[in-house]
Curated annotation (Swiss-Prot):
One of its GO terms (molecular function) is phosphoribosylanthranilate isomerase activity. Pfam families: IGPS. It comes from Priestia megaterium (strain ATCC 12872 / QMB1551). Its EC number is 4.1.1.48. Signal peptide: none annotated. This is Indole-3-glycerol phosphate synthase.
Length: 255
């Protein structure tokens, strides 16, 4: 599936028109995750659909969802901008950025320098770079380009093999372990537990996917995660603010 998405991206890049520069303040994604509101930093994801789950949110109002996340004390937001597979759009990110005061991560399949430039222009504070989608040297090149644009990077891996190849080239400040198997789409928090042992101690570790309950939060924290990225389990709730409180065991419905 990832290969298919990358091929689509390559085609999209051929026709990519760069938007006007958004006049919005840059906010540090790294600082927000390093100084969390709770025991773990929360990156709450604004996501309408996905290839594995189909449509997640029918009445999709990205700005309202983002505001509800901020009210629930999310430390940062992640916004899907991939149109073809996730029904996202770059305007969702630009619109959200106008209405919240927390940093916003652009969640997309970034494989080319023009997309880094595009991310900066639409107002992103950080971008996702996927270890399985890029050769380590290419990933490092995009990472450095992002830094020049004052963009932080969440560098995501799905396997120990990818992490080791990456660390042989350079050490990203923020490393995400995605708990979803790229071939089966199944999630297992064991991924975080196993791979976390090999992440250098000074790096900020994010556990992504498959986090639904407070027990899951505790499990990945115990494994060494300093932050979590949660999308689907929050998006499926009617009230995103309450959903965050429930996830962290703060509401009366938590147990």
């Amino acid at each position: 599936m990832l290969n298919k998405i990358i091929e689509t991206k390559k085609e999209e890049i051929q026709n990519l028109q760069l938007p006007e520069q958004q006049n919005v303040a840059k906010r540090s994604f790294l600082d927000a995750l390093s100084n969390p509101n709770r025991e773990l930093a929360l990156i709450a994801e604004v996501k309408k659909a996905s290839p594995s789950k189909g449509l997640i949110k029918e009445n999709f109002q990205p700005v309202e969802i983002a505001k509800a996340y901020e009210k629930g004390k999310a430390d940062a937001l992640s916004v899907l901008t991939d149109q073809h597979y996730f029904q996202g759009h770059r305007t969702f990110l630009s619109d959200i950025k106008q209405h919240v005061s927390v940093p916003v991560l652009r969640k997309d399949f970034i494989i080319d320098s023009i997309q880094v430039e595009e991310s900066a222009r639409i107002g992103a504070d950080a971008i996702l770079l996927i270890g399985e989608a890029l050769e380590p040297l290419k990933l490092q090149e995009l990472y450095l380009q992002a830094a020049e644009k004052e963009l932080d990077c969440l560098v995501e891996v799905h396997s120990l093999e990818t992490l080791e190849k990456l660390l042989a080239v350079f050490t990203p400040k923020i490393i995400g372990i995605n708990n979803r198997n790229l071939h089966t789409f199944e999630t297992s928090l064991q991924q975080t537990k196993e791979i976390a042992k090999h992440v250098p101690k000074d790096q900020l570790l994010v556990s992504e996917s498959g986090i639904y309950l407070y027990d899951d939060v505790s499990y990945v924290k115990e494994a060494g995660a300093k932050a979590i990225l949660v999308g689907e389990s929050l998006m499926r709730q009617d009230n995103q603010t309450k959903a965050i409180e429930k996830l962290f065991g703060e509401s009366e419905y938590a147990h």
